[in-house]
């Protein structure tokens, strides 16, 4: 689910923190990708002309494998070295959110049974898509045969992606979930695994610029995310993105915000959930269950051609001609991928206080100019 309204806050208040780029801009970069999120996208988006999922003659779904194979190839073609991270056991606090998802699925199943029009049926069917253990296992087998590394996270995949990025094993974490920022990844890439046909640029969010532009510490930013509503606990009823940011700037922490609301000074406009586990939720962001990135060795190896043909073509009935063509692209891309970026030859020096202040000032100016532009009317010549 991610964090409600966080993207809109960043877009409005710190637009300079989001850079929209073509995939070619990430040539030479290593990226840790949220595998479960990607597989979910593939199961929904990779479809036959009639709208059904791709499958073998015996009914085995193959949309996830088709998506994984060709989207990974696209990254390799553009000089990106992907590493996929799979979810482990969800935190106990997430059980409430998972229960809500189960209830929504049951409701959707009822609507599907009652649906009469084909378009309506298709809409409900897509909402019922779920990544299974079998989907994950098949994707891991495919990646292993392709020579693409993957990591089995002990907990949340986004947290492990952020850990790899923080420790410099990869450049960025890639996920659609905005809560990845709360795990302190230096960069978050969104839309990386989208279909090329969608022509959607990749959104690169710089966490440091976000914090500077919002004038929040990382701890306050995490508290803001929890207040907006995350997978670990409910939000404060009646508090939307605008109010949440205002309260965080005025009070500085969830403890003080809760104290302010419960004191009655807010005229009972908002209600804090009973036994609200915001401190436990905060702990999951600050100290997530991850493998230390220094213990992980990411290796990209040559694809196992014969085994890939056997798996994709003979077992999953993919076109052998297309798979062989894909393998050649994979071999070429992984071979040429050793060429690094120019900035890889230089030591990264931490930004000075003056540089950070300049970045924050630039973000404020961009916000001011954006507001001014909205009020202007362009005359026709």
From Swiss-Prot:
Its EC number is 3.1.-.-. PROSITE patterns: XPG_1, XPG_2. Binds 2 magnesium ions per subunit. They probably participate in the reaction catalyzed by the enzyme. May bind an additional third magnesium ion after substrate binding. Pfam families: XPG_I, XPG_N. Residues 1-105 are annotated as: N-domain. One of its GO terms (biological process) is maintenance of DNA trinucleotide repeats. GO terms for cellular component: cytosol; mitochondrion; nucleolus; nucleoplasm. Phosphorylated. Phosphorylation upon DNA damage induces relocalization to the nuclear plasma. DNA binds at residues 47, 71, 156, 229, 231. Its cofactor is Mg(2+). Mg(2+) 2 binds at residues 177, 179, 231. One of its GO terms (molecular function) is magnesium ion binding. The keyword Mitochondrion applies. InterPro entries: 5-3_exonuclease_C_sf, Flap_endonuc, HhH2, PIN-like_dom_sf, XPG-I_dom, XPG/Rad2, XPG_CS, XPG_DNA_repair_N. SUPFAM superfamilies: 5' to 3' exonuclease, C-terminal subdomain (SSF47807), PIN domain-like (SSF88723). Residues 120-251 are annotated as: I-domain. It is found in: Nucleus, Nucleolus; Nucleus, Nucleoplasm; Mitochondrion. Residues 338-346 are annotated as: Interaction with PCNA. Interacts with PCNA. Three molecules of FEN1 bind to one PCNA trimer with each molecule binding to one PCNA monomer. PCNA stimulates the nuclease activity without altering cleavage specificity. Structure-specific nuclease with 5'-flap endonuclease and 5'-3' exonuclease activities involved in DNA replication and repair. During DNA replication, cleaves the 5'-overhanging flap structure that is generated by displacement synthesis when DNA polymerase encounters the 5'-end of a downstream Okazaki fragment. It enters the flap from the 5'-end and then tracks to cleave the flap base, leaving a nick for ligation. Also involved in the long patch base excision repair (LP-BER) pathway, by cleaving within the apurinic/apyrimidinic (AP) site-terminated flap. Belongs to the XPG/RAD2 endonuclease family. FEN1 subfamily. This is Flap endonuclease 1.
């Amino acid at each position: 689910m991610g964090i409600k309204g966080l993207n809109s806050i960043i877009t409005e208040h710190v637009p300079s923190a989001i850079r929209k780029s073509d995939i070619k801009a990430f040539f030479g970069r290593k990226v840790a990708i949220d595998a479960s999120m990607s597989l979910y996208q593939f199961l929904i988006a990779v479809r036959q002309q009639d709208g059904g999922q791709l499958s073998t003659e015996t009914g085995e779904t193959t949309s996830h494998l088709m998506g994984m194979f060709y989207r990974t190839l696209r990254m390799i073609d553009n000089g990106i070295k992907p590493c996929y991270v799979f979810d482990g056991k969800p935190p106990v606090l997430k059980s409430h959110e998972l229960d809500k998802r189960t209830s929504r699925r049951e409701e959707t199943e009822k609507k599907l049974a009652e649906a009469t029009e084909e378009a309506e049926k298709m809409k409900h069917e897509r909402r019922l898509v779920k990544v299974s253990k079998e989907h994950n296992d098949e994707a891991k087998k495919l990646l292993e045969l392709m020579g693409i590394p993957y990591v089995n996270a002990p907990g949340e995949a986004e947290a492990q992606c952020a850990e790899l990025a923080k420790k410099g094993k990869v450049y960025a974490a890639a996920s659609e979930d905005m809560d990845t920022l709360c795990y302190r990844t230096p960069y978050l890439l969104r839309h990386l695994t989208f279909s090329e046909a969608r022509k959607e640029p990749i959104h690169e969010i710089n966490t440091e610029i976000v914090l500077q532009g919002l004038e929040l510490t990382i701890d306050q930013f995490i508290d803001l995310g929890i207040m907006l509503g995350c997978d670990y606990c409910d939000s404060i009823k009646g508090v939307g993105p605008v109010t949440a940011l205002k309260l965080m700037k005025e009070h500085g922490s969830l403890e003080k915000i809760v104290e302010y609301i419960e004191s009655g000074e807010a005229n009972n406009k908002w209600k804090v959930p009973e036994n609200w586990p915001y401190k436990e939720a905060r702990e999951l962001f600050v100290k997530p269950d991850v493998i230390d990135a220094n213990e992980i060795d990411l290796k990209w190896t040559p694809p196992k051609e014969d085994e890939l043909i056997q798996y994709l073509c003979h077992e999953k009935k993919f076109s052998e001609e297309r798979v062989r063509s894909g393998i050649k692209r994979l071999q070429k891309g992984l071979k040429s991928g050793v060429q690094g970026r120019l900035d890889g030859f230089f030591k990264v020096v931490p930004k000075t206080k003056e540089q950070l202040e300049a970045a924050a000032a630039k973000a404020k100016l961009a916000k001011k100019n954006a507001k001014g532009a909205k009020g202007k009317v362009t005359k026709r010549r």
